[in-house]
Swiss-Prot record:
Protein name: Integrin alpha-V
Membrane topology of the entry: Single-pass type I membrane protein
InterPro entries, A to Z: FG-GAP, Int_alpha_beta-p, Integrin_alpha, Integrin_alpha_C_CS, Integrin_alpha_Ig-like_1, Integrin_alpha_Ig-like_2, Integrin_alpha_Ig-like_3, Integrin_alpha_N
Motif segment (GFFKR motif): 1015-1019
Gene name as annotated: Itgav
Species of the source: Mus musculus
Domain of life: Eukaryota
GO cellular component: alphav-beta3 integrin-HMGB1 complex; alphav-beta3 integrin-IGF-1-IGF1R complex; cell surface; cytosol; external side of plasma membrane; filopodium membrane; focal adhesion; integrin alphav-beta1 complex
Presence of keyword Metal-binding: yes
């Protein structure tokens, strides 16, 4: 597996393969790095300008430069394609970049057309480092061959420039070639300088890619250089050697750093070995004196590329170098439990020589390659602790790249970035890779703060971020007196004759900072009274001069000078204007640098130290009647009762709770009675028609999805207060599973201590009450025999062949308030007597949630029913059988009752479904009086009472958890059959009609006369002319009456 974002050559069957699988990565930002006007540098298109970056400060010049590697740039070397360059860029407004000439020659030959080296595509500039006048730049893909062999081998080469002298440095170009030696060394893949003027070079391809570290003295490299000698031996060289075969493919030298880890004052060598330990990855620390092993770190996840990047710096100020190790392919589980690539940096703090404590810092985005580059920044904000930058070159919007700035502190690295730098370029043929290379810890503009350069080789850019000077402010705020007496009104309120209770607010600023800060610093200061009150709430204190809770001021202080102070007077509003007397009044002071503050000598605007608060606050308290400590401790109690102990389900149930609230302790401020309302109830209001009950002010509100009634009990609710109040509720939304309704009551105040009473619950039981009735009617209720013109037919076919229509109607009605879910209705119908049919059922109909069945076939003779409504039919039948011929007076004893005890009855059984309050189920039974039976001689001249009966039984209620009593009843419906003459209506005498007409006319005449005397029929029109108006005047005054 090749590195994520680095070049590395490995042999494969059939030839060599160049692997560049991760030239794509992301960017970050620190709080005092200037992101408003960074210096942007552009290189030749497609040259990978920005692949490596560093600062350069030659002793022969007062100017600072940037060094930027462009490993795919074309050069003037004859016959060379993409030989690569290192450019020197001016840190001035011109931002001009010029290539540094290290090598102007083409390939050298053993003989004509027999080259010994191959400089095309050598990636010169893939690594660049400087130290004072010295610059080391390398081409890790430089190839050469020996005279005896034709294979090209990527040994790598470097050039070292010291002032005007430039020498080639190729420690892997030796006779020990091929894969088992240094033939695939790729020397210069990673490089660094030590303080003792040694060069450290990594060659991850040596010894079957075990890798190798090589260190030589700069002086010896320069002194021994001979352009005619291709393989130079150095006497003071330190180098790792080949190891056992199990260390093959480890990539020692993939990344390097230096630092003193054994306390001898000589910098030691740190190297990442990302494929060691079966791809877990390792980091080795070697002694800088003899290349012996000092310490090893091992990764915890396979293929995470632990050791891809390394850095060494003292992050916590204990004078021990700490180690930072990047693993950009590290995977962690997301919130969904799935593994995702986030990258990781291990921070190993050295607490004593060789004693490390490691913590992990995971990346913030998926596939961002967090940890691809790590750059020590020096003390970026001048707080006494070094800081560090970590790149995620493929993070951010559209993978433009991110660089995170983390600040050091005494406990180690702050895990939250103080600033995030974002790449500004969209991907073109490849991602911008902003942050793939970084270098810091150098003060380019000499303002006392180190700066940072970031490379984005995917868009051929490098960006210089300069650090802004940091201002540290010491702010003071005093409030006196801190206990405010509302009754001590001694300050005149401007513009009025009123006096108010007042207090003083004194605020001060002092500022200082390191570096080239301007002498005068301007601040925008804002003071806010009663800060903790929410927006829109009444602020209890105002400034006297502007009657506002806000005061804004521009203050000027001298850097490093004395504390600058000012004083204002504020006052309390009248106590009738606010309720909260208990909460402290917070006086809040906030400050920020004024934009008019001059820039420093380098043109950068100062910035406030973000690690010190930019505000300060103090508190004042309103004097309370709570003893010497001014702390009120109430003793709140609540009790509740009601005269209603039971509520019927379905009823509108008005419920009155009588609540007793009392305070047996010190004053309770903003005291409120809070009643939590159950979902079955609604608040109606406060009982106001009872003199014994307090008329509280109550409001309904919802808090955290709990419905509440909140009643004001006083501010304060003084010691010894007892209140009795009535609250009315309606309870009407009970569910079928409820057995009771519960109200929770408590008293709450804004006091700091004992501010809530014990919660009291009041429970009212639910009960079932269903007033169900059954009633019936016969239509008609009386039939007179004989039927005129009726003739017997042996096989009747129509209703007229049988007899008149008789309809019995039964209604089962639930008058509530509770519902029932199932009932049985039984109808007993007098069908036959002595084998003679009485009432022949044609059919029955239902209205409502009911299904019925009969135990005998209905209408077995298939009597035809005309298509007209039953009511009309019944009425018509009634007209058809009126008898007017004779009148027969019947004795009471001559009536024969034919009910189910005597007659044979047909039974209709109905299952009734749910009936809520006010709902009914109706059964219509349409029948015919079997006239033949009553026209028999033995049945004539008798009266009959035909009775049907209906009964019901409630068998189920919808209320599962409540006890239910059995509910049943019955009723009878009677149709009377009379043999005789229907009583004719008595005619009205003619004299009665005449007398009524005359009385009406007389009454009308009296009304007309009375209205005439009152002037009802007079109509005075408005005058059209002035004369008419004058003529009308006498009449209006009553001086004449023409009509009279």
């Amino acid at each position: 597996m090749a590195a994520p974002g680095r070049l590395l050559l490995r042999p494969r069957p059939g030839g060599l393969l160049l692997l560049l699988p991760g030239l794509l990565l992301p960017l970050a930002d620190a709080f005092n790095l200037d992101v408003e006007s960074p210096a942007e540098y552009a290189g030749p298109e497609g040259s990978y300008f920005g692949f490596a970056v560093d600062f350069f400060e030659p002793s022969t010049s007062s100017r600072m430069f940037l060094l930027v590697g462009a490993p795919k740039a074309n050069t003037t070397q004859p016959g060379i394609v993409e030989g690569g360059q290192v450019l020197k860029c001016e840190c001035s407004s011109s931002r001009r970049c010029q290539p540094i000439e290290f090598d102007s020659t083409g390939n050298r030959d053993y003989a004509k057309d027999d080259p010994l080296e191959f400089k095309s595509h050598q990636w010169f500039g893939a690594s660049v480092r400087s130290k004072q006048d010295k610059i080391l730049a390398c081409a890790p893909l430089y190839h050469w061959r020996t005279e005896m062999k034709q294979e090209r081998e990527p040994v790598g080469t470097c050039f070292l420039q010291d002032g005007t002298k430039t020498v080639e440095y190729a420690p892997c170009r030796s006779k020990n070639i091929d894969a088992d030696g240094q033939g695939f060394c790729q020397g210069g893949f990673s490089i660094d300088f030590t303080k003792a003027d040694r060069v450290l070079l990594g060659g991850p391809g040596s010894f079957y890619w075990q890798g190798q570290l090589i260190s030589d003295q700069v002086a010896e490299i320069i002194s021994k250089y001979d352009p005619n000698v291709y393989s130079i031996k150095y006497n003071n060289q330190l180098a790792t050697r080949t190891a056992q075969a199990i260390f093959d493919d480890s990539y020692l030298g993939y990344s390097v750093a230096v630092g003193d880890f054994n306390g001898d004052g000589i910098e030691d060598f740190v190297s990442g070995v990302p494929r060691a330990a079966r791809t877990l990855g390792m980091v080795y620390i070697y002694d800088g004196k003899n290349m012996s092993s000092l310490h090893n770190f091992t990764g915890e996840q396979m293929a995470a590329y632990f050791g891809f990047s390394v850095a060494a710096t003292d992050i916590n100020g204990d004078d021990y170098a700490d180690v930072f190790i990047g693993a950009p392919l590290f995977m962690d589980r997301g919130s969904d439990g799935k593994l995702q690539e986030v990258g990781q940096v291990s921070v190993s703090l050295q607490r004593a020589v060789g004693d490390f404590q490691t913590t992990k810092l995971n990346g913030f985005e998926v596939f961002a390659r967090f940890g691809s580059a790590i750059a020590p920044l020096g003390d970026l904000d001048q707080d006494g602790f070094n800081d560090i930058a970590i790149a995620a070159p493929y993070g951010g919007e559209d993978k433009k790249g991110l660089v995170y700035i983390f600040n050091g502190r005494s406990t180690g690295l702050n895990s939250v970035p103080s600033q995030i730098l974002e790449g500004q370029w969209a991907a073109q043929s490849m991602p911008p890779s902003f942050g793939y290379s970084m270098k810091g810890a150098t003060d380019v503009d000499r303002n006392g703060y180190p700066d940072l350069v970031v490379g984005a080789f995917g868009v051929d850019r490098a960006v210089l971020y300069r650090a802004r000077p940091v201002v540290t402010v010491n702010a003071g705020l005093e409030v006196y007196p801190s206990i405010l007496n509302q009754d001590n009104k001694i300050c005149p309120l401007p513009g009025t004759a009123l006096k108010v209770s007042c207090f003083n607010v004194r605020f001060c600023l002092k500022a200082d900072g390191k570096g080239t800060l301007p002498r005068k610093l301007h601040f925008q200061v804002e003071l806010l009274l009663d800060k903790l009150k929410q927006k829109g709430a009444i602020r209890r204190a105002l400034f006297l001069h502007n009657r506002s809770p806000v005061h804004s001021k521009t203050m000027t202080v001298f850097r490093g000078g004395q504390m600058q102070c000012e004083e204002l007077v504020a006052y309390l509003r009248d106590e009738s204007e606010f309720r909260d007397k208990l909460t402290p009044i917070t006086i809040f002071m906030e400050y920020r640098l004024d934009q008019r503050t001059a820039a420093d000598a380098t043109g950068l605007q100062p910035i406030l130290n973000q690690f010190t608060p930019a505000n300060v606050s103090r508190q004042a308290h309103i004097l309370l009647d709570c003893g010497e400590d001014n702390v009120c401790k109430p003793k709140l109690e609540v009790s509740v009762n009601s005269d209603q102990k039971k509520i019927y389900i379905g009823d509108d149930n008005p419920l009155t709770l009588t609540v007793k609230a009392q305070n047996q302790g010190e004053g309770a401020y903003e005291a409120e009675l809070i009643v939590s309302i159950p979902p079955q109830a609604d608040f109606i209001g406060v009982v106001r028609n009872n003199e014994a009950l307090a008329r509280l002010s109550c409001a309904f509100k919802t808090e955290n999805q709990t419905r509440q009634v909140v009643c004001d009990l006083g501010n304060p609710m003084k010691a010894g207060t007892q209140l009795l109040a009535g609250l009315r509720f309606s309870v009407h939304q009970q569910s079928e599973m409820d057995t009771s309704v519960k109200f929770d009551l408590k008293i709450q105040s804004s006091n700091s201590f004992d501010n809530v009473s014990p919660v009291v619950s009041y429970k009212v039981d639910l009960a079932v009450l269903a007033a169900v009735e059954i009633r019936g009617v016969s239509s008609p209720d009386h039939i007179f025999l004989p039927i005129p013109n009726w003739e017997y037919k042996e096989n009747p076919e129509t209703e007229e062949d049988v007899g008149p229509i008789v309809q019995h109607i039964y209604e089962l009605r639930n008058n509530g308030p509770s519902s029932f879910s199932k009932a049985i209705l039984n109808l007993q119908w007098p069908y036959k007597y002595n084998n003679n049919t009485l009432l022949y059922i044609l059919h029955y109909d239902i209205d409502g949630p009911m299904n019925c069945t009969a135990d005998t076939e209905i209408n077995p003779l298939r009597i035809k029913t005309p298509e007209k409504n039953d009511t009309a039919a019944a009425g018509q039948g009634e007209r058809n059988h009126l008898i007017t011929k004779r009148d027969l007076t019947l004795r009471e004893g001559d009536v024969h009752t034919l009910g189910c005890g005597i007659a044979k009855c047909l039974q209709i059984t109905c299952q009734v479904g749910r009936l809520d309050r006010g709902k009914s189920a109706i059964l219509y039974v349409k029948s015919l009086l079997w006239t033949e039976t009553f026209m028999n001689k033995e049945n004539q001249n008798h009266s009959y009472s035909l009775k049907s009966s209906a009964s019901f039984n409630i068998i189920e209620f919808p209320y599962k958890n409540l006890p239910i009593e059995d509910l049943f009843n019955s009723t009878l419906v009677t149709t009377n059959i009379t043999w005789g003459i229907q009583p004719a209506p008595m005619p009205v005498p003619v004299w009665v009609i005449i007398l009524a007409v005359l009385a009406g006319l007389l009454l009308l005449a009296v009304l007309v006369f009375v209205m005439y005397r009152m002037g009802f029929f007079k109509r005075v029109r408005p005058p059209q002319e002035e004369q008419e108006r004058e003529q009308l005047q006498p009449h209006e005054n009553g001086e004449g009456n023409s009509e009279t």
